[in-house]
Amino acid sequence: MSVCTQCGMCTNSGGNTDRLPSLFDSIGPIMTGPSSSHTAGMVRIGRMCRQLIGGTPDTIDLYFYGALSMTYKGHASDSGVVAGLLGQLEDSPGIKMALQAARAQGIPVVVHRYPDDTSHSPATVDTELTRNGERYRIVGLTIGGGEIQMSEVDGFPVELYGSEDGVLFSASKAYAAAELSAAVGATFQSCVSTVNDGVYFHTAISDRSLSEDAMAKLKLLASKVYPLAGLWDFKLVNAEPLVNSFDELLARAKASSIPAVAEEFEAKRSGVTREWIRKKTLGAWKTMKASVVAGLGKNNLVAGFMPGDDGAKLMKLVNKGKNLSGPIVGTAVARAIGVMEANGSMCCVCASPTAGSCGVVPGCLLTSAEQLHSSEDQIIDALLVAAMTGVLIAKRAPVSGALGGCQSEIGVASAMAAAGLVQLAGGTPLQCCEAMALALKNILGLICDPVAGPVEIPCIKRNAIGVGNAYVAADMALADIRSVIPPDEVVDALINTQQLLPRELRGTLIGGLASTKTARQLKDVWYKRMEEMG
């Protein structure tokens, strides 16, 4: 197979075992909708830029490429970057008003669009910023589920994911970690440099952000300094994974359970305690439940074309006992649709693993937890199984529709939910993994073909099929029906399918439903609305 070079997706989905997601990259981030990649991810890129330039910028220029240059308004991507630059967090309700906030502070924001560009990843945001007379150019990418990678700072390549502490700086010579540590009075684990035209650009990583004294000493050595501090309350402290595969997960779970292995995995990865992990998981669960309530409240005003009350309509039918799929699946689907409508209305949701699929896991687990009268600890265990499932997939394959099709979002969410349902029902570790495999392979090939731009058509209703598929897979696994293709090989198949999927079917508004007459008409309406929104 020839590998396309247009967006980097083939490289990103090639089984990158160097990348080690957290459990809370799978059930997280907790965020304001509508897109984990193009809203929450953009906030995080904005936060990184703010940190690197040392505070709020004086001017902001944003560059969007390819499909994102036409969908960014529906995803609130421009608002997201600006919100981050102003110091807001991913779950801030002020994201939707960030452009107005910048204007009120006298900060000009200019968006540059390049829809025909194929030289950049469609998940790229390129920023040009000024602060206190200094100019900066910083480039970042969203890589799925709210995760980010900063790729360039002032023309120099970098590889930063948002959890690092330390500093970037330019100097007239190269510094090794030991030399730099002695010079500034801080301890650096690593210091690597690249050179261009006699300028040495350094990435110096420490276990904590630099003190004011160390920063002052560094400024005497450097021509330009970019502060670096981790963005969230956990970080990668050990890149050696506890388990690499579902086979290894099962082998380790024989002596305990998948939830216990998940806790051990995160404790090793992030240097946190079991109590911290369970408390943070409970926080994700509370957000999920709140998003269900918000979604069925019939007060949602989605950004684009949907009415915002389809979940409530289905719930009404279920409550009357008139739906065909029964009370459990019907309720779970109604809740999933409602959560997605809340997401489209820029309410707070928990990406699981993405915002575009954030209805599947809460719809399934809340409904079955009520059915089974599950305790809080049992629900946390089920979420840990779902999260561990997501980690082992995301470790090797992108969880982004723009990078791998909707199979990467709804497919992975359905697999996570199926595994969590089996855990909730008292299933074995093997049954949990089989449920994952059965669910994921049923949705292989699902394309990403959004209509016009907002995270609505077909995203909202595709969460419904993710729910139905999760229940079917969970029931089969609980009956000891096995996937002939083993779980890890099903992930291999996902990667293969992602690589073969053409860019026209990966969120570019070209193929699938986006090619229909109605979709083209809605696209024209949306683009006109975009022009009016500036």
Language-model segments: which ranges?
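Glycine/serine-rich anion-binding loops at beta->alpha junctions
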Residues: 30-43, 341-366, 407-414
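Phosphate-handling active-site elements
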Residues: 50-61, 88-93, 368-383, 424-435
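Generic N-terminal targeting/processing segments that precede catalytic cores or assembly contacts
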Residues: 2-149, 154-179, 183-346, 480, ...
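Alpha-helical support elements that line or immediately flank enzyme active sites
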Residues: 39-53, 174-177, 362-374, 418-426
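Helix-rich "cap/lid" substructures immediately adjacent to catalytic or cofactor-binding pockets
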Residues: 325, 329-345, 367-396
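A structural-propensity feature for long, helix-poor, extended segments
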Residues: 61-111, 384-420, 430, 442-469, ...
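C-terminal binding/interaction regions
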Residues: 424, 438-507
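Alpha-helix capping and helix-loop boundary segments enriched in small/acidic/polar residues
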Residues: 33-37, 323, 352-355, 377, ...
